[in-house]
A protein has these predicted regions:
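Conserved N-terminal phosphate-binding loop of PLP-dependent enzymes in the Aspartate aminotransferase
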Residues: 1-134
Length: 134
C-alpha cells in the first residue's frame, strides 16, 4: 500500500492511496477518507505533476543523484566516526550523528547545520533526538 500527499499535487491539498485491487476491494465504500478529498483543480495539478515527473525523468535523476550523495556521505562516515549512520532512498538521505558512547550527538548535528547554512547550504535536523540531518 502506498499513501501519498503533499507533493502529489505540487502543494495543493490532495492525497491518495494506491494498493493491489484485492486489498482496495476489502474496504467498504465510504469507510475511508480524509481531509484532502480531491477537487478538480487539485486533481488536475496532480495529473500535471505526475506527467512532469515521468517526462523529465525525475525519479531516475533522484536515484542517480541519491546514489552519488550516499557514496559521498558514506565516505565521510568512514572518515568521521561521529557519523553513526547514513541511510536513505533516492534523494531523501540522512546522516545520523552519534557521540563516542553511541548516544545522540544533537549539539554536533545542530552545529553542522549552522555551519552549512553559513556556506549557503540549507539542511535541517530531524528525528526524535534532533541528531539526524537531512
Amino acid at each position: 500500500m502506498l499513501v501519498m500527499a503533499k507533493g502529489l499535487a505540487s502543494g495543493l491539498p490532495l492525497s491518495g492511496i494506491a494498493a493491489r485491487r484485492e486489498l482496495m476491494e476489502r474496504w467498504v465504500p465510504g469507510s475511508h477518507g480524509g481531509t484532502y478529498g480531491g477537487n478538480a483543480v487539485a486533481c488536475a495539478a496532480a495529473v500535471a505533476t505526475i506527467r512532469a515527473i515521468r517526462e523529465e525523468g525525475l525519479l531516475e535523476n533522484a536515484q542517480r543523484m541519491g546514489a552519488r550523495l550516499m557514496e559521498s556521505l558514506q565516505a565521510l562516515q568512514n572518515e568521521f566516526p561521529v557519523v553513526g549512520d547514513v541511510r536513505g532512498l533516492g534523494l531523501m538521505v540522512v546522516s545520523e550523528f552519534t557521540a563516542p558512547d553511541g548516544s545522540p550527538a544533537t549539539d554536533l548535528a545542530k552545529a553542522v547545520v549552522k555551519g552549512c547554512l553559513k556556506r549557503h547550504l540549507m539542511l535541517l535536523t530531524c528525528g526524535p533526538w534532533d541528531n539526524t540531518i537531512r
